[in-house]
Amino acid sequence: MQPYCVFCRIIAGQEPANVLYEDDSMIVIQNILRWVPVMLLAMPKEHKAQSEAWADMGHIGKIASEIGKERCPGGFRLTSNFGYDAMQSQEHAHVHILGGTFLGHYVG
């Protein structure tokens, strides 16, 4: 756990979050941002960089896809930001699950 990381603090139960899924290695939470009707975050419980987590994205991708299908039957988008230029705001690796409306060409 990184004490400065809000996601690590959520995983440790030190910060509130609406947890939608959790297992031994990952968690899915409701994003506090609400740009589209469904904005969720899927992440490993272990603090990892985006590039490190994407090297082994199988389980997170599978669960994120399943939850996306369940919550956004009309379609959804999975996306991640890598680094400052891509507007990555948290160092803890995570995947955005976006949907619940027509997303257009460039949302997320």
Regions found by a protein language model. Give the residues of each.
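HIT superfamily nucleotide-processing domains
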Residues: 1-108
